[in-house]
Protein backbone atom coordinates (compact mmCIF):
# COMPACT_ATOMS: atom_id res chain seq x y z
CA UNK A 1 0.00 0.00 0.00
CA UNK A 2 2.93 2.32 0.57
CA UNK A 3 3.92 2.31 -3.11
CA UNK A 4 0.33 3.06 -4.19
CA UNK A 5 0.03 5.98 -1.76
CA UNK A 6 3.38 7.40 -2.91
CA UNK A 7 2.44 7.08 -6.59
CA UNK A 8 -0.91 8.78 -5.97
CA UNK A 9 0.75 11.65 -4.10
CA UNK A 10 3.27 12.13 -6.92
CA UNK A 11 0.50 12.10 -9.55
CA UNK A 12 -1.59 14.69 -7.69
CA UNK A 13 1.47 16.89 -7.05
CA UNK A 14 2.51 16.67 -10.71
CA UNK A 15 -0.97 17.68 -11.84
CA UNK A 16 -0.98 20.65 -9.46
CA UNK A 17 2.45 21.75 -10.66
CA UNK A 18 1.51 21.46 -14.34
CA UNK A 19 -1.73 23.39 -13.75
CA UNK A 20 0.19 26.18 -12.03
CA UNK A 21 2.75 26.36 -14.84
CA UNK A 22 0.00 26.45 -17.48
CA UNK A 23 -1.91 29.24 -15.73
CA UNK A 24 1.30 31.24 -15.28
CA UNK A 25 2.14 30.89 -18.98
CA UNK A 26 -1.38 31.90 -19.97
CA UNK A 27 -1.07 35.02 -17.82
CA UNK A 28 2.27 36.06 -19.32
CA UNK A 29 1.31 35.14 -22.89
CA UNK A 30 -1.44 37.77 -23.04
CA UNK A 31 -0.68 40.68 -25.41
CA UNK A 32 0.91 43.67 -23.70
CA UNK A 33 -1.83 45.94 -25.06
CA UNK A 34 -4.59 43.90 -23.42
CA UNK A 35 -6.17 45.30 -20.30
CA UNK A 36 -6.03 43.22 -17.13
CA UNK A 37 -8.72 40.58 -16.90
CA UNK A 38 -11.54 41.34 -14.47
CA UNK A 39 -13.84 38.98 -12.60
CA UNK A 40 -16.72 41.45 -12.93
CA UNK A 41 -17.62 41.89 -16.62
CA UNK A 42 -19.28 45.23 -15.86
CA UNK A 43 -16.08 46.68 -14.43
CA UNK A 44 -14.06 47.20 -17.62
CA UNK A 45 -13.84 45.97 -21.17
CA UNK A 46 -10.82 43.98 -22.27
CA UNK A 47 -8.96 45.76 -25.07
CA UNK A 48 -9.15 43.91 -28.36
CA UNK A 49 -5.85 43.11 -30.07
CA UNK A 50 -5.04 44.89 -33.31
CA UNK A 51 -5.18 42.62 -36.35
CA UNK A 52 -3.17 42.96 -39.57
CA UNK A 53 -4.51 41.05 -42.56
CA UNK A 54 -1.94 40.13 -45.22
CA UNK A 55 -3.26 39.54 -48.76
CA UNK A 56 -0.58 38.55 -51.29
CA UNK A 57 -1.74 38.51 -54.91
CA UNK A 58 -0.20 37.64 -58.25
CA UNK A 59 -2.04 37.95 -61.58
CA UNK A 60 -5.36 37.72 -59.74
CA UNK A 61 -8.61 38.27 -61.59
CA UNK A 62 -9.78 41.83 -60.72
CA UNK A 63 -13.30 40.67 -59.78
CA UNK A 64 -11.97 37.92 -57.53
CA UNK A 65 -9.55 40.32 -55.81
CA UNK A 66 -12.30 42.91 -55.39
CA UNK A 67 -14.62 40.35 -53.76
CA UNK A 68 -11.84 39.22 -51.43
CA UNK A 69 -10.98 42.77 -50.33
CA UNK A 70 -14.66 43.69 -49.97
CA UNK A 71 -15.16 40.72 -47.65
CA UNK A 72 -12.25 41.90 -45.52
CA UNK A 73 -13.53 45.49 -45.52
CA UNK A 74 -16.92 44.30 -44.24
CA UNK A 75 -15.54 42.53 -41.16
CA UNK A 76 -17.51 43.25 -37.98
CA UNK A 77 -14.35 43.31 -35.83
CA UNK A 78 -14.53 46.08 -33.21
CA UNK A 79 -10.76 46.37 -32.75
CA UNK A 80 -8.16 47.96 -35.00
CA UNK A 81 -7.93 46.24 -38.40
CA UNK A 82 -5.20 46.96 -40.98
CA UNK A 83 -5.06 45.27 -44.39
CA UNK A 84 -1.82 44.93 -46.37
CA UNK A 85 -2.45 44.00 -50.01
CA UNK A 86 0.77 42.92 -51.73
CA UNK A 87 0.84 42.84 -55.53
CA UNK A 88 3.69 40.46 -56.28
CA UNK A 89 4.76 41.92 -59.63
CA UNK A 90 1.55 41.03 -61.47
CA UNK A 91 1.60 41.21 -65.26
CA UNK A 92 -2.05 42.36 -65.18
CA UNK A 93 -1.39 45.33 -62.92
CA UNK A 94 -3.27 47.63 -65.31
CA UNK A 95 -6.39 45.48 -64.77
CA UNK A 96 -6.14 45.25 -60.96
CA UNK A 97 -5.05 48.90 -60.63
CA UNK A 98 -8.64 50.19 -60.35
CA UNK A 99 -9.32 47.67 -57.57
CA UNK A 100 -6.21 48.86 -55.74
CA UNK A 101 -7.37 52.50 -56.12
CA UNK A 102 -10.81 51.76 -54.69
CA UNK A 103 -9.45 50.12 -51.56
CA UNK A 104 -6.51 52.55 -51.21
CA UNK A 105 -9.13 55.18 -50.30
CA UNK A 106 -10.01 53.15 -47.20
CA UNK A 107 -7.56 54.15 -44.41
CA UNK A 108 -7.46 50.54 -43.19
CA UNK A 109 -5.94 49.37 -46.49
CA UNK A 110 -2.34 49.66 -47.61
CA UNK A 111 -1.35 48.62 -51.14
CA UNK A 112 2.22 47.37 -51.59
CA UNK A 113 3.43 47.04 -55.19
CA UNK A 114 6.48 44.85 -55.69
CA UNK A 115 8.55 45.56 -58.81
CA UNK A 116 8.90 41.92 -59.78
CA UNK A 117 7.50 38.54 -58.81
CA UNK A 118 9.37 37.22 -55.76
CA UNK A 119 6.95 34.49 -54.68
CA UNK A 120 4.13 34.26 -52.16
CA UNK A 121 6.28 33.84 -49.04
CA UNK A 122 8.51 36.83 -49.80
CA UNK A 123 5.44 38.91 -50.64
CA UNK A 124 3.98 37.97 -47.24
CA UNK A 125 7.26 38.86 -45.55
CA UNK A 126 7.25 42.29 -47.26
CA UNK A 127 3.83 42.98 -45.72
CA UNK A 128 4.70 41.54 -42.32
CA UNK A 129 7.73 43.85 -42.10
CA UNK A 130 5.44 46.85 -42.37
CA UNK A 131 2.76 45.44 -40.07
CA UNK A 132 2.37 46.37 -36.44
CA UNK A 133 -0.66 44.38 -35.31
CA UNK A 134 -0.84 42.10 -32.30
CA UNK A 135 -2.15 39.35 -34.60
CA UNK A 136 -1.40 38.65 -38.26
CA UNK A 137 -3.89 36.87 -40.50
CA UNK A 138 -2.81 35.65 -43.95
CA UNK A 139 -5.59 35.48 -46.54
CA UNK A 140 -5.23 34.27 -50.13
CA UNK A 141 -6.43 36.79 -52.72
CA UNK A 142 -9.11 34.40 -54.00
CA UNK A 143 -10.72 33.89 -50.59
CA UNK A 144 -13.99 35.42 -49.46
CA UNK A 145 -14.33 35.74 -45.69
CA UNK A 146 -17.52 35.66 -43.66
CA UNK A 147 -18.12 38.95 -41.82
CA UNK A 148 -17.25 37.47 -38.41
CA UNK A 149 -14.00 35.64 -39.23
CA UNK A 150 -11.67 38.16 -37.56
CA UNK A 151 -13.96 38.47 -34.54
CA UNK A 152 -13.88 34.70 -34.05
CA UNK A 153 -10.07 34.64 -34.01
UniProtKB/Swiss-Prot annotation:
GO terms for molecular function: glycosyltransferase activity. It is found in: Cell membrane. Its EC number is 2.4.1.-. The keyword Glycosyltransferase applies. Keywords: Cell membrane, Glycosyltransferase, Membrane, Nodulation, Transferase. Its main location: membrane. Transmembrane segments: none annotated. The keyword Cell cycle does not apply. It comes from the Bacteria. Pfam families: Glycos_transf_2. It is a peripheral membrane protein. GO terms for cellular component: plasma membrane. Involved in the synthesis of Nod factor, a sulfated N-acyl-beta-1,4-tetrasaccharide of N-acetylglucosamine which initiates a series of events in the host plant species leading eventually to nodulation. Belongs to the NodC/HAS family. This is N-acetylglucosaminyltransferase. The lineage of its organism: Bacteria, Pseudomonadati, Pseudomonadota, Alphaproteobacteria, Hyphomicrobiales.
